[in-house]
């Protein structure tokens, strides 16, 4: 038996942080959101921030570039899942190894 599950996910981010991230890492958050479209993306816990939210790392391919996206999960009032992007950059060597294993 096979089920198809369709979930609407909304992405959000701080626009100023997006501009700063582009300057620092050369990755914009709109492109970073595409990591979640990679069927083989890898998800790992990062840490809990000062506000008590659990941060996550998603690693996935976007246009043949392997990116790491730091994000948190939130829910809207109507129950829609929200992924808030905090930062994004190209992966480091050890992070790439974890993706391709």
Language model features with spans:
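Ribonuclease/tRNase effector modules and their secretory precursors
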Residues: 1-101
